[in-house]
Amino acid sequence: MKKETKKKIVSGFNQILIFLGIFIAITWWQQKDMLPTSSSLRAPNFSLVDMTDNVVHFNPSEQTQKTLVYFFAPWCSVCHISIDNIESIKQSSDGKINFYAVALDWKSKQEVETFLAEHDLTMPILLGTNETLNDFKIGGFPSYYVIDSNGILQSKDMGYTTEIGMRVRLGLVEL
């Protein structure tokens, strides 16, 4: 192999390492204020109204299966892209996982309905409050928490995630 070719390969590899380092640093920075995932921290309880004005209660100590809680804002363009990934996962999970989508930072129920009109969703859509935002330490949209069957925070993420990335976090795909 020529010396120039080796230099280009090394340079490309170094650029990939720099990109990965920056990506990891940004991801850490985005998630640093979210609730920690650990072997003992239970997810917060909530009682929120759904889009048909029914109250939905979530108590992690009563969990019997894994749950994904997806927090979105109706004005968030990334949320428009990622919520369809979540719905696709829900459709294929055969009811083995609970799914909740929680609207935050909304001004009116109509604003949330306008967002939902662009998506064919079957998961419960809940109207979150400032208390919900604070309890789950949501600092950006979309944000996700995976909660295990014991109510323990297992995984978290903020920003766009691919469908395969979320399937891995939910344990639906093994690497």
Ranges and model annotations:
Residues 57-80, 99:
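Short active-site neighborhood of thiol/selenol oxidoreductases, capturing the structured segment around
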